[in-house]
Amino acid sequence: MFKRKSTAELAAQMAKLNGNKGFSSEDKGEWKLKLDNAGNGQAVIRF
């Protein structure tokens, strides 16, 4: 089983892996949120 030896080592590994600092929302077809006139929300989420 995996055992963590050092939290500092884990943080260093995560810093190396986390090259992308956030979610890219360039693709508008992937996430859509709409409100109708009454204020009701509707979302389409595609994976």
Swiss-Prot record:
Keyword presence, Protein biosynthesis: no
Keyword hit for Metal-binding: yes
InterPro entries with a match to the protein in the record: NA-bd_OB-fold, Phage_T4_Gp32_ssDNA-bd_sf
GO biological process: DNA recombination; DNA repair; DNA replication
Protein keywords: DNA damage, DNA recombination, DNA repair, DNA replication, DNA-binding, Metal-binding, Zinc, Zinc-finger
Gene3D superfamilies named among the record's database cross-references: Replication Fork Single-Stranded Dna Binding Protein
GO molecular function terms listed in the Swiss-Prot or TrEMBL record: DNA binding; zinc ion binding
Function of the molecule: Binds preferentially to single-stranded DNA and therefore, destabilizes double-stranded DNA. It is involved in DNA replication, repair and recombination. Binds ss-DNA as the replication fork advances and stimulates the replisome processivity and accuracy.
Miscellaneous comment in the UniProt entry for this protein: Interacts with the polymerase and the uvsX and uvsY proteins.
Quaternary structure and interacting proteins, as annotated: Homodimer in the absence of DNA, monomer when binding DNA.
Protein name listed in UniProt: Single-stranded DNA-binding protein
Species per Swiss-Prot/TrEMBL record: Enterobacteria phage RB6 (Bacteriophage RB6)
